[in-house]
Curated annotation (Swiss-Prot):
It is found in: Plastid, Chloroplast. Belongs to the universal ribosomal protein uS2 family. InterPro entries: Ribosomal_uS2, Ribosomal_uS2_bac/mit/plastid, Ribosomal_uS2_CS, Ribosomal_uS2_flav_dom_sf. Pfam families: Ribosomal_S2 (PF00318). GO terms for biological process: translation. One of its GO terms (cellular component) is chloroplast. Its main location: plastid. Transmembrane segments: none annotated. This is Small ribosomal subunit protein uS2c. The gene is rps2. Keywords: Chloroplast, Plastid, Ribonucleoprotein, Ribosomal protein. One of its GO terms (molecular function) is structural constituent of ribosome.
Length: 236
């Protein structure tokens, strides 16, 4: 795997609040190796460990992107949703930021059918065919289109299972993580002090509640993916 410099520094992570964990009563003992202290009733994440795993994740996504691999970014809680969409669009990744529909990956044939329906409806809307239908039929199909746009809009160009899935919140996206584990899809996951570090392929200990923390982690991963994609374009 290619080793590169990703400009990951502890001061920047401290400013973003990456080190702030959950209250000491809400923790997973498996996170003990990633916790450096307790402060005012909350656990403090060891940022040296965070930097190590973030570096490893950046190397992985760069290497994958440089070989033309496909990524899916998942983060559906309100405070992360816009960041997830922004990061995915910038790095030309697929994303889910509203609600994870159970079986989205493990029942891919059903998802594929929904995507075909979504594409057909979008085409009918663009060509004006929907407006030529009886009002009741048009209204029903427009509601369907709106529903599909909300939940599948971020994966509308996905033609198969992703090669790597990036998950912003382990607890919130547990169903998505389990589907990836079932299918053997490599995962990168932000893990707060109440998470299980053993579930993802690369777990990055970090505050998964603060927007500034989520933004910093996604920024680093997106930059690495974009660099990898540039390398792929130059040397296909």
């Amino acid at each position: 795997m290619t080793k590169r410099y990703w400009n990951i520094n502890l001061e920047e992570m401290m400013k973003a609040g990456v080190h702030f964990g959950h209250g000491t009563k809400k923790w997973n003992p498996k996170m003990a190796p990633y916790i450096s202290a307790k402060r005012k009733g909350i656990h403090i994440t060891n940022l040296t460990r965070t930097a190590r795993f973030l570096l490893e994740a950046c190397d992985l996504v760069f290497d994958a992107a440089s070989r033309g691999k496909q990524f899916l970014i998942v983060g559906t809680k309100n405070k992360a949703a816009n960041l997830v969409a922004w990061a995915a669009i910038k790095a030309r990744c697929h994303y889910v930021n509203k609600k994870w529909l159970g079986g989205m990956l493990t029942n891919w044939s059903t998802t594929e059918t929904r995507l075909h329906k979504f594409r057909d409806l979008r085409t009918e809307q663009k060509t004006g065919r929907l407006n030529r239908l009886p009002k009741r039929d048009a209204a029903m199909l427009k509601r369907q289109l709106s529903h599909l746009q909300t939940y599948l809009g971020g994966i509308k160009y996905m033609t198969g299972l992703p090669d790597i899935v990036i998950i912003v919140d382990q607890h919130e996206e547990y169903t998505a993580l389990r589907e990836c584990i079932t299918l053997g899809i490599p995962t990168i996951c932000l893990i707060d002090t109440n998470c299980d570090p053993d579930l993802a392929d690369i777990s990055i200990p970090a505050n998964d509640d603060a927007i500034s923390s989520i933004r910093l982690i996604l920024n680093k991963l997106v930059f690495a993916i974009c660099e990898g994609r540039s390398s792929y374009i130059r040397n296909p």
